[in-house]
């Protein structure tokens, strides 16, 4: 169980970071969320041989990509854009490998631990396989969790009754509130998949035939706001809403089936561990966040929210 295995790690990391923010009297929310998500996930994975702030900066560079269109040849990019994408994609991976992954692998060979890297080494995985896993955890497990923490905190700070309910609730109810927030505000707005076999899907009585190689755009935000799936008032935040059988509380925000995000429980639990401690400090908003859009994972980006903590 994630809650049992990593609870102490999430709680101690959150307490340390909130204590540091309280001493400073203020914090920038997206930076706090990033460093916290990176610190927790790094421990889970085993990327513990480099400083968290430096690794955080390297991970955010993964997302510096020119626009693209999956339905067009060469992603709709010019030759110059393709060259820029290759450089922007490969150079951060190389830096991440040399500064974070390789030192961690060396340390784990000398001293195995109970984490992902040690498990991969036990299975005979090579450095390339370990790098792929670390990049996957680094982008999905760290950077996207940063966005959800920021969005969930913003919702709770803007809604006094919801914040009071959250702080007074037990963990199950708090997680229910977070499920509803991420249903309404999925971090990844679209999932793109290539069809592997001939399939037929129906939509409102109409059949659509899909052939191998066809590109399917799964509109996560739209699906999560479908009254047929999530009930009445789909665009309102209603924790504990009654859902049909087979529909999860977070909708498609963590995917589904074979591609369902394996880190969904960790993401929600670490968000809860940080927000309960942050909101207990009764933060005051000094600067509202700016809302942007990230084409790479078709999701929102919140930056610049400043919070005052304590009496500072």
For each feature predicted by the language model, list its residue ranges.
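Cytochrome P450
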Residues: 1-312
């Amino acid at each position: 169980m994630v809650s049992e295995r990593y609870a102490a790690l999430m709680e101690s990391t959150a307490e340390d970071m909130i204590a540091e923010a309280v001493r400073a009297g203020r914090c920038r929310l997206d930076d706090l969320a990033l460093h916290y998500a990176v610190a927790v996930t790094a421990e889970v994975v085993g990327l513990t041989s480099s400083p968290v702030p430096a690794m955080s900066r390297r991970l955010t560079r993964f997302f510096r990509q020119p626009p693209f269109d999956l339905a067009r040849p060469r992603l709709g990019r010019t030759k110059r854009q393709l060259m820029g994408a290759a450089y922007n994609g490969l150079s951060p991976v190389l830096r991440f490998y040399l500064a974070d992954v390789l030192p961690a692998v060396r340390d784990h060979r000398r001293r195995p631990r109970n984490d992902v890297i040690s498990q991969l080494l036990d299975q005979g995985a090579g450095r390339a396989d370990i790098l792929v896993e670390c990049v996957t955890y680094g982008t999905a497990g760290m950077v996207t969790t940063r966005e959800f923490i920021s969005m969930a905190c913003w919702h709770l700070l803007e809604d006094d009754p919801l914040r009071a309910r959250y702080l007074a609730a037990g963990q199950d109810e708090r997680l229910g509130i977070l499920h509803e927030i991420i249903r309404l505000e999925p971090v990844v707005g679209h999932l793109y998949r290539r069809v592997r076999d001939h399939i037929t899907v129906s939509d409102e009585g109409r059949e659509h035939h899909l052939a191998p190689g066809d590109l399917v755009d799964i509109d996560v935000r739209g699906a999560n706001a479908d009254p047929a799936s999530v009930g009445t008032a789909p665009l309102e935040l209603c924790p504990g809403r009654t859902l049909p059988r087979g529909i999860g509380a977070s909708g498609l925000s963590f995917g589904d089936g074979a591609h369902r995000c394996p880190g969904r429980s960790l993401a929600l639990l670490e968000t809860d561990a940080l927000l309960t401690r942050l909101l207990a400090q009764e933060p005051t908003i000094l600067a509202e966040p700016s809302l942007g859009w990230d084409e790479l994972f078709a999701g929102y980006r919140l930056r610049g929210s400043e919070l005052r903590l304590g009496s500072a």
